[in-house]
UniProtKB/Swiss-Prot annotation:
Pfam families: Hexapep (PF00132), Hexapep_GlmU (PF24894), NTP_transferase (PF00483). It comes from Streptococcus thermophilus (strain CNRZ 1066). It catalyses: alpha-D-glucosamine 1-phosphate + acetyl-CoA = N-acetyl-alpha-D-glucosamine 1-phosphate + CoA + H(+); N-acetyl-alpha-D-glucosamine 1-phosphate + UTP + H(+) = UDP-N-acetyl-alpha-D-glucosamine + diphosphate. Binds 1 Mg(2+) ion per subunit. Its cofactor is Mg(2+). This is Bifunctional protein GlmU. Acetyl-CoA binds at A379, N385, Y386, S404, A422, R439. GO terms for cellular component: cytoplasm; membrane. GO terms for biological process: cell morphogenesis; cell wall organization; lipid A biosynthetic process; peptidoglycan biosynthetic process; regulation of cell shape; UDP-N-acetylglucosamine biosynthetic process. In the N-terminal section; belongs to the N-acetylglucosamine-1-phosphate uridyltransferase family. The gene is glmU. One of its GO terms (molecular function) is glucosamine-1-phosphate N-acetyltransferase activity. UDP-N-acetyl-alpha-D-glucosamine binds at residues 8-11, 22, 72, 77-78, 139, 154, 169, 227, 332, 350, 365, 376. Mg(2+) binds at D102, N227.
Length: 460
């Protein structure tokens, strides 16, 4: 029998105090909505329906092409939100999962277990529950003396006895699809919130003698719904621990996993060593036996095997195997450092390809350049690539030697085995095997220093 899914993503999230819809706030690199969608995908629904409302177009963009959408123009409660999905699911045979888009910690495994429990017990409705040490604010699961679920009571509607119950409603359910939409026609707004509660369909099913069950999560953390920035930080913390644990199990060494921040889509090979205060974001990939030291920050980049990145930033770039970067280097977008490259202290590379075994040890800027292999950059080298309106390219061939404090005025080509003298400003192309000197000849004025204030003879 087919499975379907309804993701509730219409709310504004007032307590987030944000212009961004609540479900679009990110946890470990992707939106909460994407986390939920990925978990839901594990049950392989025949159809996904996402209920959107506040800033609908922004929410639609996240799952465009992956889900059907339906609008909830007025936020009149969870029951009302599910009603909006009827046009997409009416009359279909099967089970429908209903889940909120602000529950980023739920796992696909738990949702699959929930579906299996529902089917195996032949329930009309199954509630995903959890046991909370502090259940305040949650809807409570009320059972009879036989342990059967009789109803769900919201916090504001719960009496003193019901408020003591620690089994809580996570806001995730599985329903017989046809019976869900039939029951929704019979709910009303006679409650403290004046809303259509989805939970009221549970009471309707019970009154009709239909079977309602509950499947309890093993891990309460999965039930977290994010309603404010405090809960968002909690979700980030839980997700970080999960991600780092998974990498450690797969052979990655963490100096301090509590101070290492890795997005959910990052890939790390075995035998990588990661020191504290490292951040890996986006689609970053790190090759085997690499070392990332304290303070390294890498975004959407590929790092080859056996590299060492020392306290440096790398953005949208590729670093091939055996390269070393840092400390205090900045590899800006669209750069490629080929095998064995060394980029050292206070070196910035932007939009450039650096050939094999090339070295730029310190205090250098390489921008919009094509650099061959075995090139050496002396300290203080600058590629001057921008004239205020346009950017120009510098091309440096294999085995060139760029003397310290060279200023290379692009567009410029430097040939194989060429050398620029230290302190030169190079404005013209340098042929292969040539030495380029672009500086004034030194003139010594003997005895002139005696008249200068620093000279001992001028001291009083």
């Amino acid at each position: 029998m087919s499975h379907y899914a309804i993701i509730l993503a219409a709310g504004k999230g007032t307590r987030m105090k944000s212009d961004l819809p609540k479900v679009l706030h990110k946890v470990s690199g992707i939106t909460m909505l994407e986390h939920v969608f990925r978990a839901v995908s594990v049950i392989e629904p025949a159809k996904n329906v996402t209920v959107i409302g506040h800033k609908a177009e922004l929410v639609r963009e996240v799952l465009d092409g992956q889900s059907a959408f339906t609008m909830q123009t007025e936020q009149l409660g969870t029951g009302h939100a599910v009603m909006m999905a009827e046009e997409e699911l009416a009359g279909l045979e099967g089970q429908t999962l209903v889940i909120a888009g602000d529950t980023p910690l739920i796992t696909g495994e738990s949702l699959k277990n929930l579906i299996d429990f529902h089917v195996n017990h032949k329930n009309v409705a199954t509630i995903l529950t959890a046991t909370a040490d502090n259940p305040f604010g949650y809807g409570r699961i009320i059972r009879n003396e036989n342990g059967e679920v009789t109803k769900i009571v919201e916090q504001k509607d719960a009496n003193e006895f019901e408020q003591q119950v620690k089994e809580i409603n996570t806001g995730t359910y599985v329903f017989d699809n046809k019976r869900l939409f039939e029951a929704l026609k019979n709910i009303n707004t006679n409650n403290a919130q004046g809303e259509y509660y989805l939970t009221d369909v549970i009471s309707i099913f019970r009154e009709n003698g239909e079977k309602v069950g509950a499947y309890t999560l093993r891990d309460f953390e999965e039930s977290l719904g994010v309603n404010d920035r405090v809960a968002l930080a909690t979700a980030e913390d839980v997700m970080r621990r999960r991600i780092n644990k998974a990498h450690m199990i797969n052979g990655v060494t963490f100096q301090n996993p509590n101070a290492t921040y890795i997005d959910v889509d990052v890939e790390i090979a075995p035998d990588v060593v990661i020191e504290a205060n490292v951040t890996l974001k986006g689609q970053t990939k790190v090759g085997a036996e690499s070392v990332l030291t304290n303070g390294t920050y890498i975004v959407d980049s590929t790092i080859g095997a056996n590299t060492v990145i020392t306290n440096s930033m790398i953005e949208h770039s590729v670093v091939e195997k055996g390269a070393t970067v840092g400390p205090f280097a900045h590899i800006r977008p669209d750069s490629m450092l080929k095998e064995g490259v060394h980029i050292g202290n206070f070196v910035e590379v932007k939009g450039s390809t650096i050939g094999e075994n090339t070295k730029a040890g310190h205090l250098t800027y390489i921008g919009n350049a094509e650099v061959g292999s075995d090139v050496n950059f002396g300290a203080g080298t600058i590629t001057v690539n921008y004239d205020g309106q346009h950017k120009f390219k510098t091309q440096i061939a294999n085995n060139a030697f760029i003397g310290s404090n060279s200023t290379l005025i692009a567009p410029l080509e430097i040939g194989d085995n060429a050398l620029t003298a230290a302190g030169s400003t190079i404005t013209d192309n340098v042929p292969a095997d040539s030495v380029a000197i672009g500086r004034s000849r030194q003139v010594n004025k003997e005895g002139y220093a005696i008249k200068k204030p620093h000279h001992p003879s001028q001291q009083k």
